Amino acid sequence: MKKNILIIYTDQLKRDVLGCYGGNEVSTPNIDALKEDGVILDNFYTPSAVCTPSRGCLMTGRYPHRNGAYRNGVPVNREEHGFAEVFEQAGYHTGYLGKWHLADHKEMGEKLGEYNSLGFCEWEDKVEFGHCKSIFRDNGEAIPSKNMGDDKSYTTDWLANETIRFLKSRIGKEEPFLFMVSIPDPHQPFAVRHPYDTMFDPLKMQVPESFYQKEIPDWAERDTWGRMHYFPRGMFEREGHFRRAKAQYLGEVKCIDDNVGKITAYLKNSGLWENTIVIFTTDHGEYLGEHGLMEKNNLYESVYHIPMVMTLPGMSVKSRNCKTWLNVIDFGRTLAGLVDIPYLYETDGLDRSRQILNNETSLEELYIHPSDVPRAGILTPDYELAYVGMGHCGEKFHDHVLFDCKKDPLQVNNLFNNPDYRKIQEELTEKIRVHHRMMKTPKKFLPEEVW
């Protein structure tokens, strides 16, 4: 009997706020509990820390410039194939609900039928982006919770309820299902419904060690989304604003966890649990005050290193921390491998299912791909090297970075052009060049140093 698959996909979730990844400020027992019947991936990475490019990578198994969705607002190429298409052809009933963010901004919600649904046969994108709290941009305060809905209408709750409605519709059906629900939280603006809006005291919020970092690269100071796009410039340099935003963010995470519990409770009570792989993950991380920044994008490791917890029913794998390095582009092939389905289309990713089941190591490298400006980098267990050529406003940057991740896990000491690390820098730079030649990355997406 083929396994059902349920993917719970969040937006901008910081990995280490979850209890299963060492977080201690918000309790996430329902997400954490997924590990009891499967694995938690310690090394899951996205090649692009921006919504659309990361989502395109997950869906197609191909890097952003190859699938077309290289920045927000640019859809996946119509000729692309998604992992859901592979499952649909293997006899699965496929469904999608929630934030899509792989279509044109201007026509979102109007002409979705004209876009590539990537193999999802039953799908609804009712919530569009789901981030309707734009008043935050003007005054730095969250919208009052009375405008946020209740446990039936708030986006996260509504999506969980609709997911359960879908699961109910599959009871007694012989055809297995693959269903993906995309929750648009805990993405900014940071606001959540009652009682989650008052659940965490801003005065008790922990401030990251690097919050007051004095020396940061020019691109981080001027071109990180948390300072440029959604908030008054420098807003989060004021600790009070940061603490209030973080309290709301943790409230969003708690709301997500409660709804994961509601979904898993239904799976168990309905008898679906024993034959359903449940995967919890996100598109990219969140700085949440690290380096004095909020949101995503740019080149620090924490927004590329993302959570994934999955159940593996009937596979003799329980309560395991898996050390296998998994790239988002590996997701589709690996998922197909876990249920013994051949993958019919070309991807840039690989099947890591055997490594996950056997807790084996894999190639421990992640190549950072640009979104819409020239950036390129590489992450390994020991180092991160990253080049940046231009900002979102067209300004040129030359303050590239090299971090020794073992000696400097907070990434506050830039070693670029340090004589003691020259050989490492040269070796990693050549790896970046070779990778992008193999991927045929257009030069317009790359800094000159890695052409």
Where are these regions (language model features)?
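Formylglycine-dependent sulfatase
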Residues: M1-H398, P409-R437, K444-W451
